[in-house]
Amino acid sequence: MTGLLEREALLGLLAEARREGGRLVFVGGEAGVGKTSLVREFCGRADARILAGACENLATPSALGPFTDIADRAGGPLAELLAAGADARAVARALLSEVDDATIVVIEDVHWADEASLDVLRVLGRRVDGVAGLVVATYRDDEAQGDHPLRTVLGELATSPGVERLTVPRLSLEAVRQLAAPHRADGDAVHRLTHGNAFFVTEILAAEADSLPETVRDAVLARVASLEPGARRLLDVIALVPVRAELWLLEAVAGDVLAHLDECIGRGILRTDGDGVAFRHELARLACESAVPAARRRLLHAAILAALESPPVGGPDVSRLAHHAEEAGDSGAVLEHAPAAARRASAAGAHREAARQYRRALRHGDGLPASGRAGLLDGYGLEAQLTGQASEAADAWEEAAALYRESGDGVSEGRALGWLARACIPAGRNAEAEAASRGAIDVLESLEPSPELGRAYATQAYMRMLNRDNDEGVAWAERAVEVAERFGDLETLSYGLNTLGTSHLVAGEVDTGIALLLRSFDVARENGLWLWIGPALSMLGSGLGEMYELERSEQYLREHIAFTEEHDLWPQYSRAWLALVYVYRGRWEAGAELAHAVLAQAQDSISRITALVAIGRVRARRGDPGAFAVLDEALELATPGGHLQRLGHIHAARAEAAWLAGDAERTISEAEAAYPLSLEKRHLWFAGELAYWRAQAGRADAWPEWVAKPYRLELEGSPRRAAEAWSARGCPYEAARALSASNDAADVLGALEELQRLGAGPAAAAVRQRLRALGVAAPRGPRPATRANVGGLTIREVEVLRRVAEGRRNADIAAELVVSRRTVDHHVSSILRKLGVGSRGEAARAAAALGLLDDPRHEDADGPHVPSASPRSGERAERPRPS
């Protein structure tokens, strides 16, 4: 029995990937389906050096664990870097230097990978096409579902040229019959029981029982029961050590039964693994682990813990110590090792693992003094916030603040309250954020001045800036800067300057804001404060975008995205803003593409809101369906916060969508939903656009003369000057919209030409209606069915979608379009994502709804009717006077 029936095609694909070189191949499949056996068979056939490592099934995995295994085999710079505590990027670079055409790197079970190891995989995926070798990573696809961290990594690397994915299928009925025949077993019954899972099949057949066990656990334990008692006791120990048990560890814990090791290996239960042994299948280990009585399990974990505390070479692995300490019920050891493991994981960039270790310590920390437990909560709160667990972080800092108050530590209480405020904002707990921020200031102002007071001022400034209370934001930020400079607190100085600059910038004081933000950037860069370099660039990009300084906005957004990619930070908010900038600059296809990519990856509300607004604007302006669907989602996300910087964008986009759909009443209601707030905050651009849509829909009351110049000129009835102002800011759609209000037919024809170039169907239809009313022949527009970019799709994606709707297979589509099957696979995945559907059938229905399957000869080129945005010839529109 080879155990590798029906695997030759997969082995061939792996061999092809090795021949091509520069590949990271993810091999997925359910637990026990045969991923590891496939990779071992491939490696056994290859004439290559094999560097293998595995992720551990610990409650909290060791940071960079699989790469430590690889370093033990490779030695050299990689081992030196890991011993020195290098970060994920450095580890990835060192590993890539080992990957040549004579080397295969294998990383097993990456669904258990710690965060730092996932970061290494990200870098490998982006850069592996620059080397000659092959990296293979196995994972359980049935465990990496939903919001699993590995799923995010796979999504991010989906378009990387050097990354491929293979799926190991279950064995067919015929294959199971072939495997069962030598054992005289009922192959049909085995297949019914196992559904073709290779491990289940192998274990059941290996049991060689007269009747089939009811479960795989029974099969595994039946095999174990036939071993000598000493061998069973040895398996009890090995089953409690995830991944691999070193021989020295077994000598220390189970030396009296170590002689039975060969028996366990010979019976196919264990396999050798370097200087240790491991179960041949993880499911077998789990089955054996579950059979160890609870009292014996605790005693064995305690013995393993004692041995691991004094390894024969090097220092102890605190992650493993924390795991076995908890399993042994040794709270003292947990409190010693779990915080140390958390700090080590955090330093390696594995913040999720750090948070888990702090949670582990907190589970055992009820008996600690108030200050001791508060310190653990501090650590957990920070790691939770860094990993997007805002509510958990807020709860931790709330408890920490109470404990510091109980212990009389006012400075620490104030610091915790400040962090609590920051955590409550993304958690949507705005009232708590306000109370915590004010509480931090009250506590710290009652004490001697301290750096923590400056941080509290900076947090209050940040909150005021977010709500566009710009004068208050400036005042609080100036106080933060003054305290930071007094104490030489460079981090708070950069933080305060960041908020100070942003407050000036979004108040319309653009040059002042830029200068302050660049100073914040310089302070961070010159002092190695990497945490604050990114925010300076991000605020420059998004703030300038909000002020329609689009060229400079794009420059800083690109710089921030490049910075995040270089340092493996989170780029999605800047990518969402860049998508919106593309839309305003008339690059609708690029904007929609990028916004959809953001939605595929981002979970934070602010990134999603911005991307949804970009998509909603494009859909409304093109006349595509679904504009309000995405804008409804954006509004739902933004409403709890109540911040103008979100609501202003959303209601302006919704007012425009309503106007282009011919609904004047809804245009007014959407505009007025945020107009009073925009006036209260004196926001030049939100107030200007909302006033414009109110006026277009007939609400002709006073508007403030301080609104942004392009909108002021439109409201005053100066279409040419308004168009020039929009053109100067790089906004072709807005310029054409403004020019269409001219009484000069040549101007209106020019506006129509630009709107048609952009694919702005509804606005172009309104302009053609007006031209007819003026007695001017309106040129026929492009046919909707031939217009590219419907629903945010590229021209090629539209071609593929039409063929999908016809029921064509990907291979047939590839042959017809003369592209690779893989290219068509990528197109289909992109189409499903952009259309928000989950199947080819749903995509076909969406294609019909978008008009992609209609005969273009029967379509009305004028598109839907919308109210005219311009006065009739010889008339001057009634314009409200400035207040």
Task: State what each model feature region is.
Residues G22-L24, L38-F42, T68-D69, A102, ...:
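Extended alpha-helical scaffolding segments used for macromolecular assembly and cargo binding
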Residues A31-V33, L171-L368, G379, L677-K681, ...:
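Short secondary-structure boundary elements
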Residues G32, Y139, A287, H323, ...:
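Tandem amphipathic alpha-helical repeat scaffolds
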Residues V33, S37-T103, W112, A132, ...:
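Conserved phosphate-binding/catalytic loops and adjacent sensor/switch elements of nucleotide-binding enzymes
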Residues V120-L166:
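Sensor-1/coupling segment of RecA-like P-loop NTPase cores
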Residues G266, A342-R343, L362-R363, A401-G408, ...:
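Amphipathic alpha-helical segments of tetratricopeptide repeats
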Residues Q769-R772, R780-H858, P871-S883:
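Helix-turn-helix DNA-binding segment
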